[in-house]
Amino acid sequence: MKTNLKELLEFPTSFTYKVMGLAQPELVDQVVEVVQRHAPGDYSPEVKPSSKGNYHSVSITINATHIEQVETLYEELGNIEIVRMVL
């Protein structure tokens, strides 16, 4: 039996994205810019470098109001050129 995200969440809810991308200075700004378009707010993303320093992970938590918002952000964050993965 498959369970999808919509069945697991009750909205509004706090939802954290972890975005992995190339270790470039603009990564955080690009992530926040995309999030601001769909969930305006004051964000302080947490940034962690990879062990070799080639990649950064950016964790950012939003107050999600509906499943479409969550899904749209997954898609748009993944479309950032220097992003390699979104969890």
Swiss-Prot record:
SUPFAM superfamilies in UniProt: YbeD/HP0495-like (SSF117991)
Superkingdom to which the source organism belongs: Bacteria
InterPro entries, sorted: UPF0250_YbeD-like (IPR007454), YbeD-like_sf (IPR027471)
Any one GO CC term of the record: cytosol
HAMAP family tied to this protein: UPF0250
Recorded family membership: Belongs to the UPF0250 family.
Protein name, UniProt field: UPF0250 protein ETA_23570
